[in-house]
């Protein structure tokens, strides 16, 4: 072979070796390594962690390491770390001489960089492997800075048992972050990777103590610590058995284990607030458990940032009980009445309702659905704001029927209710009473956006990064009346907060689901939104499970401990919302009795600010000019119940009924289909017809399909058993006034609907 050929071969060999050397390290170091799921609060404090899939406590890689550990590990493992290029010939020579003198291997001479390579490769500790590690170490030094190599070492070094990395070791052995370790604690951990199996804390304590103390004396000799540091460090005890990691917001930690496993997640949680609120819910959990109510969830949201500051998925998670592991804050639950403010605000915004519009509160049957108020009573007519504050069900159903279930469902979805995935037909009118299921997290965030929307500038709604992007409730006037109505809700302790300056003002709403299975309380101020759910995770009801009596007190306890913020702008000050002086609204004359726009028959009027669309609403339909006098006349069905609660109401007694209805069917509704169950003996159950007459003393004569069936006086109710099919009931009073209603009877063979 010629000299030129040999030269080419050498060149190719050198080039090949250079290429091999350049690519000898994997592109991503420690790829495929399983890490623990780590969750921290907004300031980086550990909320909790979950062990890696391989059973190791190995936190995700850190970018930097504490200065004390950096000093300690360099002093103990590789004093010349800052000077060498991955391999220290002096250390290798010293180790070789020492091993020969001892007659066995006493030191390996590996640098920190070589140890990182060994951790990466996981090969046996042989001479050949050490040579490979030396080559790879030089390449590692070319790729990364000294700080990065130290961070890799600190993240992957073994610290005994199933503990890997300085962060996990600091928490497992000392129950604190690595940055807070003392010199004695840091030195203890620094000597562990050298022989983790032999000096695992709790096993060979004497050997561990000797190694730690030698390192401390060495650092003192080299000027790393002073005499005081040395004296204090030598007096520190060794760690005992491994400690449990923090368990703050454990349901939130579990959520991140499922959604972001093996990663480090920094949340918006304030750990100090979290601990306080956890203590509140734990205390109430002890109280409620005595009456068969075992679970509580609570969420606190910062109104202006939309951040979740505290997240209690379930109280007392360490207390072993069925359902303790269920994250209620993210579990869809029946909403009860908690969604009513969104309907009230939406209708105000669209001009389909005025703040105090009188709404019917009378028995209704809407396609077989007959809503009932919580107290089983009827007011006849009630202002819309009062109906919201008192959480009356019948007016709410009337409002939803008028607004439309599909429209309201779209509003709720745009407000952030992510669990309402079924059609409007599926929910029906019961949507406003708990026929749908939402999560506490979604509901609390939606309430916070009501507060934020009122305080936000109009341009905020166009910002895609804003929590208000796509939020449908924007009208300042509608939002103000909604918040104002909600602050009138009675508190659980029956105290009038307006008389006590130290009690925080809160706009809040409760909800209780059918069967007393879910109790809600969600409140909002200009600063915070707080949501609380109380019940049993497994779904069983309890007699005392009512929102105002259970979730309400918990919510107010949380509000009372939240820190106040400085608020002083055009929408909020001194902890409460200011009446709007800016915005697209109008001033209009409103009837104080009916809540409608004042009409020509109204005796007086109030000048109110209203959303601009309110001008399309109808004028007062109840004030009439009769014989030259302005008279307030309710429909008979509303009047019957209204005058029982309003003795000042003077019922209208016309001489004839040419212009005003003198009687009205309360039940059934004209054209309705009535589903009645078949009894056990095969017969069909009867129904009770209900009529309101302006003159209760009047005699009413009842006819079913033109056949006389009876008469009533004072209380105009009559039970009949019509056959399946279409029918007409006609009533005639003793003055000759008549009224008819048509309906259809259908038999429900399954026993009801």
Which ranges hold each PLM region?
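Short pre-catalytic segments that frame enzyme active sites
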Residues: 45-58, 168, 197-201, 254-261, ...
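Residue-level preference for non-acidic, small/hydrophobic
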Residues: 44, 73, 116, 149, ...
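Juxtamembrane regions of bacterial inner-membrane/periplasmic proteins
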Residues: 2-290, 303, 307-309, 314, ...
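Surface-exposed patches in mature extracellular/periplasmic domains of secreted proteins
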Residues: 81-90, 128, 150, 225-231, ...
């Amino acid at each position: 072979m010629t000299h030129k050929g040999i030269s080419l071969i050498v060149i190719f060999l050198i080039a090949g070796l250079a290429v091999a050397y350049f690519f000898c390290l994997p592109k991503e170091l420690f790829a495929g390594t399983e890490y623990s799921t780590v969750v921290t609060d907004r300031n980086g404090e550990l909320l909790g962690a979950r062990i890696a899939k391989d059973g190791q406590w190995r936190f995700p890689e850190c970018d930097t390491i504490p200065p004390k550990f950096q000093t300690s590990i360099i002093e103990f493992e590789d004093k010349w770390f800052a000077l060498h290029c991955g391999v220290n010939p002096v250390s290798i020579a010293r180790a070789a001489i020492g091993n020969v003198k001892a007659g066995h291997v006493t030191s390996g001479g590996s640098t920190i960089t070589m140890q990182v390579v060994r951790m990466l490769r996981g090969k046996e500790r042989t001479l050949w492997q050490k040579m490979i590690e030396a080559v790879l170490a030089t390449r590692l030094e070319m790729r990364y800075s000294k700080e990065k190599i130290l961070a890799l070492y600190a993240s992957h070094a073994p610290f005994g048992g199933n503990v890997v990395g300085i962060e996990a070791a600091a928490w497992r052995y000392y129950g604190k972050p690595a940055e807070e370790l003392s010199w004695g604690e840091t030195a203890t951990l620094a000597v562990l990777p050298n022989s983790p199996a032999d000096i695992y804390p709790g096993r060979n304590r004497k050997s561990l103590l000797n190694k730690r103390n030698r390192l401390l004396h060495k650092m003192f000799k080299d000027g790393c610590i002073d005499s005081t540091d040395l004296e204090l460090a030598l007096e520190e005890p060794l760690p005992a058995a491994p400690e449990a990691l923090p368990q703050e917001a454990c349901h939130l930690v579990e959520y991140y284990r499922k959604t972001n496993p093996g990663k480090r997640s920094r949340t918006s949680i304030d750990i100090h607030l979290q601990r306080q609120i956890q203590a509140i819910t734990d205390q109430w959990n002890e109280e409620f458990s005595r009456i068969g109510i075992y679970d509580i969830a609570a969420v606190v949201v910062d109104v202006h940032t939309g951040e979740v500051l505290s997240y209690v998925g379930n109280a007392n998670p360490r207390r072993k009980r069925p359902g303790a592991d269920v994250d209620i804050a993210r579990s869809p639950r029946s909403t009860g009445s908690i969604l009513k403010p969104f309907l009230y605000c939406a209708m105000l915004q669209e001009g389909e309702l005025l703040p105090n519009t009188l709404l019917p509160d009378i028995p209704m049957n809407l396609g077989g659905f007959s809503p009932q108020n919580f107290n089983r009573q009827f007011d006849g007519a009630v202002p819309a704001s009062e109906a919201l504050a008192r959480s009356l069900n019948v007016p709410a159903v009337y409002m939803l029927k008028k607004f439309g279930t599909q429209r309201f469902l779209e509003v709720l979805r745009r407000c952030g209710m992510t669990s309402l995935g079924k059609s409007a037909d599926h929910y029906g009118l019961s949507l406003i009473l708990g026929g749908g299921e939402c999560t506490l997290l979604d509901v609390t965030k939606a309430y916070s956006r009501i507060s934020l929307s009122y305080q936000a500038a109009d341009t905020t709604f166009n910002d895609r990064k804003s929590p208000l992007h796509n939020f449908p409730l924007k009208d300042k006037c509608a939002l103000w009346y909604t918040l104002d109505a909600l602050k009138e809700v009675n508190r659980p302790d029956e105290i009038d907060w307006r008389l006590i300056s130290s009690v925080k003002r809160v706009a809040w709403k409760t909800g209780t689901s059918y069967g007393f299975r879910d109790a809600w309380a969600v409140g909002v101020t200009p600063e915070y939104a707080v949501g609380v759910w109380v019940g049993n995770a497994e779904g069983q009801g309890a007699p005392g499970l009512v929102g105002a009596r259970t979730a309400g007190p918990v919510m107010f306890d949380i509000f009372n401990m939240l820190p106040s913020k400085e608020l002083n702008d055009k929408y909020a000050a001194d902890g409460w919302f200011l009446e709007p002086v800016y915005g697209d609204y109008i001033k209009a004359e409103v009837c104080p009795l009916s809540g409608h726009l004042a009409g020509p028959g109204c005796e007086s009027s109030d000048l109110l600010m209203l959303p601009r669309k309110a001008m399309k609403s109808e004028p007062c339909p109840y004030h009439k000019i009769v014989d030259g006098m302005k008279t307030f006349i309710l429909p008979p069905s509303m009047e019957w119940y209204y005058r029982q609660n309003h003795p000042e109401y003077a019922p209208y007694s016309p001489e004839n009924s040419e212009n005003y209805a003198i009687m009205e069917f309360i039940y059934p509704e004209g054209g309705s289909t009535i589903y009645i169950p078949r009894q056990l003996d095969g017969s069909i159950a009867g129904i009770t017809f209900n009529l309101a007459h302006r003159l209760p003393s009047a005699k009413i004569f009842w006819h079913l399909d033109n056949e006389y069936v009876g008469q009533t006086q004072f209380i105009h109710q009559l039970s009949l058993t019509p056959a399946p099919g279409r029918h007409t009931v006609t009533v005639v009073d003793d003055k000759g006034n008549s009224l008819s209603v048509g309906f259809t009877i259908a038999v429900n063979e399954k026993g009801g609907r």
